Amino acid sequence: YLENNATSYQALTPQTAYVMNRLLKNVLYSNVGTARGNYPNSSGMESFGKTGTASDERDLWFVGGTPYYVTAVWWGYDAPYDMTNTLSKDQAKTKTCVKAWKAYMEQVQADLPYKAFPTSDGVVERAYCTQSGLLAGANCPSRATGYYRADDLPDTCNYSHSSGAASAADTQATQIPDPAATGVETD
């Protein structure tokens, strides 16, 4: 049963929460997101989300949120059952959950005014090199926008991209950023 007198505590810093929000926005807004284009049409409010499946598409999930609500949709059976027996392979790849989530969110937010996610002090937006994952250097041919905690920025990329490899000195100084401290938003 649920207790209504539980003690709460903050699990994430506001900075980490904001970076995760930016990362999960890509699921809906990026052209390679697993739920691309399925954000609710709610006065232009941003959304974030995460798709999920159990082994062999036996359970399908989508969890998403806006500045007002966070909701989850689960599609499955009490006993494990291959969803591709009743849904097409395309539908079984969480699209059914995503579409249900979108329809629900559009209804519950239909009359709500626009609201933005709060920004967080201590988070900065920077270009990063899509080949190395480091902050973009002068010679990086492919860049995207990322969000980082200001106190935990990755090094700047100094790869020799023409050869496709980093020098020994580059490799020694290069560390891929901690995913919990890094937000990624592709152009």
Task: Identify the function of each model-found stretch.
Residues 1-170:
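A penicillin-recognizing enzyme superfamily signal
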Residues 162-187:
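Ser/Thr/Gly/Pro-rich low-complexity, disordered linker/stalk segments of secreted
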